[in-house]
Amino acid sequence: DLGWTVAPGRASANGLYKSSAEGLRSREVGETYAGIADTLAALFGNSFAFSEEVPFDDSLAHHLELDLGAGTRILNFGVPGYGVDQALLRFRKDGRSWAPRVAVLTFIQDDLFRVANVYTFFKVAWGIPLSKPRFVLRDGELLLLNSPTISPPEMFSRASVFDLPLLDLEIEFFPH
């Protein structure tokens, strides 16, 4: 469970974003990357990898394909709002099976803080009621918590925000 991801075979309401049959950013709705014989490279990360706010032909993945030339396809696994933790989980869940020759991780400073969040709605700029997986280090081992994630109905069925599980791991929550 990734918290949220790009749904397969969809287009945004304004038509700017489209996704492939596999849930990757693509030029056309529902196109498939399965069975392509080209050399594959994979792009993981946040809205910069996804190339939010720009059409496909201006996306990072498209420009990488142009720079690398014929015979190379970039699989765009980027998802807006992801931290490096979710990008790693997406690689494990969706990307590894493609056996890309190269995997590229994009990140910005804020992505490093996102690894310490469980709930997105504590970030003032978000306001979106989602939860995400969270890694913690225990006895020298990475342990994945909140997987599967808590759904919005589960979150808002609580009598108080203080009743949410894993609240002690939420760095954006500052009760007064």
Which residues does each PLM region occupy?
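Membrane/wall-proximal cationic-aromatic binding patches
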Residues: 1-68, 171, 175-176
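Loop/turn elements at helix/coil->beta-strand transitions in domains of secreted/extracellular proteins
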Residues: 38-39, 70-73, 99-103
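Oxyanion-hole/transition-state-stabilizing segment in secreted/luminal serine hydrolases
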Residues: 42-44, 54-60, 88, 92-129
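Structural preference for long, well-ordered alpha-helical segments in enzyme cores
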Residues: 44, 64, 90-91, 143, ...
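Short, solvent-exposed loop/turn segments at secondary-structure junctions
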Residues: 48-49, 80-82, 108-112
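A conserved hydrophobic secondary-structure block that centers on an alpha-helix together
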Residues: 65, 69-89, 93-96
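Serine-dependent acyl-ester chemistry module
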Residues: 109-176
